[in-house]
Amino acid sequence: MSERIVIDPITRIEGHLRVEAEIEGGTIKNAYSSGTMVRGIENIVKDRDPRDVWAFVGRVCGVCTSIHSLASVRAVENARGIVIPPNASMVRNIMQAVLYMHDHTVHFYQLHALDWVDVVSALKADPKAAALLAQQLSPWAKNTEGYFTATQERLKKFVASGQLGIFANGYWGHPDYKLTPEQNLIATVHYLDALEWQKEVVKVHAVFGGKNPHPNYIVGGMPCSIDLNEANAINADRLALVKQKLEEAKTFINQVYIPDLLMIANVYKDKWSKIGGGVRNYLSYGDYPVFDLGEVESYKIPRGIVLDRDLSKVHPVDANSPEEIKEYIYHSWYKYTQGDKAGLHPYEGETHLEYTGPRPPYKLLDVEDKYSWIKTPRWKQEPMEVGPLARLIVAYAAGKEPQKSIVDETLRQLDLPVDALFSTLGRTAASGLECRMAADWALEFFNQLIKNLENGDSRMANSAEWERENWPDHEQGVGLAEAPRGALAHFIVIDKNRVKNYQMVVPTTWNASPRDENGVLSAYESALIGTPIYDPKQPLEILRTIHSFDPCLACAVHLYDEEGKYVHQVDTF
């Protein structure tokens, strides 16, 4: 007899993802990913001035803040042939690296670590033994017996109160929690440290972008003025603060995040380096231009595609080509003028809503019909995984440094083969390794910015194309970026300085989309197939694999038998 687990919503932060998984014989045999909230931003920005669009589309997500604004200004700049000043490029890179550091660290600790860490077990730990172990792993100054004891006492009072708050509804005591009490205490202490740390690193966004979340951008560069000696500009004191926060972030990542990641990976590697691989194709648009955005070879993150996990070849990708990227709606609640089986390149994309699903509230979706608000993108008819793992795999296949050396070093430390990358654990580790590189890149770009300023170059924007007497009848462009969660593309079509069409193909579109008309699964659905479930009432294994994609999720799980009959409800954090 099979059971169907319904996870809806799969994230409280954004609240728009539902997963239905069929379990048979203790293993997931089928899975369906459904976006349950329609995204209307693309229609909202129609007929607006393209120079204003970044401020609207940036609000599509408050978690990976700023990256949609960056993709939007890049799309307009691409359409109009605008080249931004080197200083603006450096500032954009710094802000993006800060986003990576913040997002990956918060994901690991606040959104994913508790899938591996048993907080209740930490209450049984010996703080002295935990501190000694932590000191062996890292020179982090807070790894002391006194600090661990004090934090454990706080946790005990928290639990004794009966109000667990953020730790409520966990699967504490689940047999697949494998860390020792001391390891659990280390990770829990650092979980709380990460909460404090994350509010500091985003001050860099406030300096350069005016605020966080949703810092300011401008078509042609950045809207901030830098003058080392001017009190009302970003001066030497403000830049000193930026450097301080970047250095603090690097220390936290290298002395807390990475050691904890390796500690956890060592415990779970035998099982979880073989589970959750999913699709076998990986896409990266590349990002972090060292020079001009058009000089793709200079990117810190390379562009390309790896097919069928073949690390001997990287295939080129052209987002402008109508023969490469298309979006399909066969299982999505939209309609195309050419019919449900048509595939459209985003320049020709349509956003016509057509909900045909059950009237809420409902128990199960009709997965043979349309079942999601997410379209299904394909590259030459192939599904792709995007995100930190995809970026790392493309870089590794390309022989790009430092990615290749860091991956090889980590695999040696964990005594794992390269194939271990294609897994839930590999996906989780990729975020941490990328975070480590982002910390180095941020300081590298900062030092280059300072050098430019010292050489007398203070330009922050190219306003030559800001105003024209006569706007062209037709312009189009694409803004490519690598968001923390993966490949991001904004496509814009402009007629006489007004947006005619705007389409966003975002990381979640690639990863969380429904299967195509041929029944080929996308990343989320595919990664769940074959996952063993110890206890359907506590489906910890599902959380581990889905969380590894970083959808910022917290779930409410309902169980049904094969006929859709209600069996049990499980609340998760």
Regions from the PLM with identified roles:
Residues 1-573:
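Metal/cofactor-centered catalytic core regions of large enzymes
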